[in-house]
Amino acid sequence: MTQKLAVVLFNLGGPDGPDAVRPFLFNLFRDPAIIGAPALIRYPLAALISTTREKSAKANYAIMGGGSPLLPETEKQARALEAALALAMPGVEAKCFIAMRYWHPLTDETARQVAAFAPDQVVLLPLYPQFSTTTTGSSLKAWKKTYKGSGVQTTVGCYPTEGGLIEAHARMIRESWEKAGSPTNIRLLFSAHGLPEKVILAGDPYQKQVEATAAAVAAHLPPQIEWTVCYQSRVGPLKWIGPSTDDEIRRAGGEDKGVMITPIAFVSEHVETLVELDHEYAELAEEVGAAPYLRVSALGTAPEFIDGLAKAVRDSVGKAPGTVSSACGWRCGADWSKCPCREGASA
């Protein structure tokens, strides 16, 4: 009898049109992983923020045609992963499902689809290489609340230094650099979405894992490429982790250097890459004289990346029910209390 395997791919989600922008923002800011206030405060605050930010957010999405490309990009990854699993796991009927956190297909919708598939095994695979309570943690909590179907469940908690991920990043960076003529007056910026510093101080391993990803990729690059890690998309009054991407662009301009920027935590093109990197930061680079300004694409369906995901799924199958494991053997120290793969953590 053919085993049925459901692979659930988690990501942020994005509005599919102008009318979806405000409800998407409301769903985002009412998440306790994003705003930690009690519900009586959080819900009105989410309504206020989504209303006040709607106009500017719509303008950003208008640059991309009115909506986010994240779902179609993720669907391409799902189909590519299914094809890779068909080769890697003959005799297994593997089907990929997409669960978005803040817009359709929402977690509860996907949970019903997976239950109807009646799988023997369910592998939860967040499309966030680096674990954070604000992304992977939030998605897994929502799944646990909603899924009532069959199947032994295991989770790929993180994969910050997984070989396929690293190889794909390194290849794409090298290709962009060589296409530009292998410039030496350039600094590579590994740009990741930032977080409030208090999230990291509370034991979230995200920053540590982002920096590990960058270091692993840099080890596969020509030694003359100078690099640094920086963080983008800061909002609100809280202190965020740094340095910020815009400050690093200004620093490069002040040193008469160009920048080559690569999204190191985003695996798909969406508003933070197609608008923030391609428009806002490109304009900033021009203003401060950081030339050339090069942007490396997100991983998308890079073969090395997809093969790495397939290996992560294959390795997760057969583990004890409820196991949360790292696809690259990552093990946070005991001080990183929010990491499900930390030393001393139970499955």
Swiss-Prot record:
Ligand binding (Fe cation): H193, E272
UniProt EC number: 4.98.1.1
Alphabetical list of CDD domains matching this protein: Ferrochelatase_C (cd00419), Ferrochelatase_N (cd03411)
Any one biological process term the GO annotation gives: heme biosynthetic process
PROSITE patterns per the UniProt record, alphabetical: FERROCHELATASE
InterPro entries for this protein: Ferrochelatase, Ferrochelatase_AS, Ferrochelatase_C, Ferrochelatase_N
Domain of life: Bacteria
Keywords: 2Fe-2S, Cytoplasm, Heme biosynthesis, Iron, Iron-sulfur, Lyase, Metal-binding, Porphyrin biosynthesis
Keyword Oxidoreductase attached: no
Family, similarity comment: Belongs to the ferrochelatase family.
Role summary: Catalyzes the ferrous insertion into protoporphyrin IX.
Descriptive protein name: Ferrochelatase
